[in-house]
């Protein structure tokens, strides 16, 4: 700042504060100067005299400033730049590195979460406590949610953790999308969303690992029906009805999947039924889970002795049973039978809830019929297949809800 000849060079408090508070390329000087008087054009602004805001050191500068000076002087171009500037717009959310592998033979989708870099700080210390969670879309729920461990106080976490979906079919690969979300864990309040990536599974080829290193994106919430215009609501309803019509009236609601193992033992003269595991079961309890168990019947059951059931698995939608049941029967007789498998939610003091079921036998269709036929044609060979559970309750099974 220039003064009269012989005067000591001084810097007023406004300039001193502006210098200290304006580091880096963020350039907030324009915003800070709104609260301090600025030297305007004219004779006061140049030469040897003091202008507005250049007060003696023993006086408060703001007290001498006129109201107009407190508002600051910005050009239209400057004002437009400030209005359009948003620090979040230029803040990277970070990148996520991971591998995906679809194992067609075992019907599994493997997702190895490797690392993230440059995550957005979420905590007061400028760091985050990140973890990754997976969902399959459409139909995101607790049944298909997988989650990594939390890495503490880092913006560059390394997980190297593998998460696996079971019971994935070729139809899932064609139609479903994997949503990978990175969140910040907060023990004192709700966890915070950082960013996400959505990968259509059709980009995967069976048994070929695919590597990804992608920038995270913001979550784009879909508009609620109440916020849509009448025209958009009408179009949405029309498309939904059209989709239901294309699917057909006979389509049953999917309630999860079950992995069954069938083997006819020629030495023991009977059928071995293995209940291996279930995946993505429907939640039947208020806590968002179920307490599932499995029952099997071999119909027609003249002696009513064909019922078997597994133990109950508490609070899970992806139970592992690994239990085996044996039905003593000649192969020729077995060819006329139907194996009914139902999954139930165990409740104390009231009727158990039916989750879903599947029937395997000569009258079945699709994969269920093929599984039964392969079992009969390949004695002494265990044949494992995943089956979709539907909401159709077998007539005979409905009479035993408490068992």
Swiss-Prot record:
GO CC annotations on file: extrinsic component of synaptic vesicle membrane; glutamatergic synapse; lysosome; neuron projection; synapse
Primary subcellular site in the record, as a coarse category: membrane
Residues that, per the record, bind Ca(2+) 1: 123, 129, 184, 186
Start and end residues of each C2 domain: 92-214, 254-387
Chain sites annotated for binding Ca(2+) 2: 285, 291, 345, 347
Domain notes: C2 domain 1 is involved in binding calcium and phospholipids.
Function: Calcium sensor which most probably regulates fusion of vesicles with membranes. Binds calcium and phospholipids. May be involved in calcium dependent neurotransmitter release through the interaction with UNC13A. May be involved in calcium-dependent spontaneous release of neurotransmitter in absence of action potentials in neuronal cells. Regulates Ca(2+)-dependent secretory lysosome exocytosis in mast cells.
Name of the protein: Double C2-like domain-containing protein alpha
Species name: Rattus norvegicus (Rat)
